[in-house]
A protein has these predicted regions:
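Domain-level signature for proteins that mediate thiol-based redox and metal-cofactor handling
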Residues: 1-203
Length: 203
């Protein structure tokens, strides 16, 4: 098993399991293999909402080739949690490990970056449609800021115009609980079709 020490690595910002790769790796990290690494990781699903990928949710921020002081190259996989302390991050790191190993890519390491903080603005339009089809109302509104711009941290508030029901489209909905199946969702009920649903909180 071969490990890779990233240049200027900050151990507090890297998930613990990662600088490792299976011995059967055939494709080293290079500019030529970078597109394959992206393609591999774009298919990794979110463990809590498997209908969307970590790229579509904006969790996967970057994949790049880095070189250490010994001249060795590796893939650096940059991820940002949806919120600090998100319990799914360890599972995401393990799923990334499995995907890279299956694809025969490496060595690699996962780097967790907390700034800029993740925002629901990073969820792609395709992911929003997939969430709706899955029965989860996507976040409404937008912060209208770039990923690198300073952003105020805001807490969840109820949308003024109601959350459209992902089942029937009605905006005549009500909050059942500010806490849904996961910490990033609220639980709603539609008054029109009477169906319950989760709403992905905007922040």
């Amino acid at each position: 098993m071969h490990s890779f020490a990233a240049p200027d690595a900050d151990p507090t910002m890297n998930l613990p399991l990662t600088p490792a790769v299976a011995p059967e790796v055939l494709t080293p990290a290079s500019a030529a293999s970078l597109p394959l690494a992206w393609q591999t990781l774009e298919a990794v699903p979110d463990p809590e909402i498997p209908v969307v990928s970590i790229r579509e949710l904006g969790i996967l921020r970057d994949v790049r080739v880095v070189t250490n002081d010994r001249g060795e190259t590796a893939f650096e996989i940059v991820i940002t949690p949806t919120y600090s302390g998100c319990p799914a991050m360890q599972q995401i790191a393990e799923d990334i490990a499995a995907a890279m190993t299956r694809a025969g890519l490496g060595p690699w390491h996962v780097k967790t970056v907390l700034a800029p903080a993740w925002t629901t603005d990073w969820i792609s339009p395709e992911a929003r449609e997939k969430l709706r089809s899955y029965g989860i109302a996507p976040p409404t509104g937008a912060h209208a800021v770039s990923a690198d711009a300073p952003r105020k941290i805001t807490f969840y508030g109820r949308p003024k115009d109601g959350v459209p029901c992902p089942h029937c489209g009605s905006a005549d909905t009500e909050v059942v609980s500010a806490f849904g199946s996961t910490a990033c969702k609220a639980h709603y009920r539609c008054r029109t079709c009477s169906e319950p649903f989760d709403y992905f909180k905007p922040y």
